[in-house]
């Protein structure tokens, strides 16, 4: 029996209930809005998806840089993102992009994390000698 996992799951539920699901959802929505505002100012970043009714995810591409390269550079800066098709290759085909980068936010993230994401994306631009803002 997976006793430790059951206990951890129970504690996770208690943690989320102590904060409140609505508060968690609002926190994520606020962070996504802030992140979108930051990244929209960057002329090389293309945000993917509608700003409305979004979960805690910022999907994007960076002109001239493959998402796996973005993920590697951001990792060196201590920023964790995902790169690839994210189990939706058909969507990527429809959008005519080879892959995308995806930053996820949750209750444990802050605006400082998104500032660091933006800083690291600008670092990618420097490394790949892309047009600066």
Regions found by a protein language model. Give the residues of each.
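Pyridoxal 5′-phosphate
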Residues: 1-133
